[in-house]
Swiss-Prot record:
InterPro entries: Fam221a/b (IPR026755)
The protein's name in its UniProt record: Protein FAM221A
Region (Disordered): 241-263
Superkingdom classification of source: Eukaryota
Organism ancestry: Eukaryota, Metazoa, Chordata, Craniata, Vertebrata
Pfam families: FAM221
Family, per entry: Belongs to the FAM221 family.
Organism: Homo sapiens
Amino acid sequence: MERLTLPLGGAAAVDEYLEYRRIVGEDDGGKLFTPEEYEEYKRKVLPLRLQNRLFVSWRSPTGMDCKLVGPETLCFCTHRYKQHKTDLEAIPQQCPIDLPCQVTGCQCRAYLYVPLNGSQPIRCRCKHFADQHSAAPGFTCNTCSKCSGFHSCFTCACGQPAYAHDTVVETKQERLAQEKPVGQDIPYAAMGGLTGFSSLAEGYMRLDDSGIGVPSVEFLESPITAVDSPFLKAFQASSSSSPETLTDVGTSSQVSSLRRPEEDDMAFFERRYQERMKMEKAAKWKGKAPLPSATKPS
């Protein structure tokens, strides 16, 4: 692997370019703006972007946002969200709000999220993949003539089929009215529905109002059963130990369970294994120790 060496101040230049790319996105047409053009672009676009930001999500019938769309999220037309028209001078009055693709020759008229099955596109009922269909309205198959339009029975992690979901484009006010998170106002292009680090997770894993929500007190205080995670069962076993046992273990074992800075994965697990074997052997010999002899009466 070739090692890259940056000159003095090179790291700052890389950070400035990344900031430029996040703000400008695809609007420069592949040719960098001059400093004057860059400042003029920010003066003109950033106020509109902060005022008219659109939040895009893939929503289930239950109201949960199973997917929050970001700049790199693919559309049905196989182009990314950042390649669609996302900066509007005014919010359209009609619903739904269409965000057409800006790639030359693409027939996509509105951004439409389509999930993936692992790393592969999902299949239509005609047995062909989503990317084998036309991006024009109607979404007919390019491979067969019997397909009347893309329709997939793929099941989302929320338990609902893909065809029951909708790609929702909404304003900040509409999202606040539903008590869904909107995050902070940021100048970056095509942020879609991303409001924080948790937005990268799927809806059933997010514990905010856009996902499955905060667990109830009854759920958090429910007893741990055999169907729960092994980590929870191990925690229950350690927390239910008697105070005497915890005192006997002491702080040495707690320190021993921490990884040392110079240890890799194999060395850490090997050391923990040897310590466990040593403890088991000591406990075994302790159990075999002879009982103290009783004094016979004279």
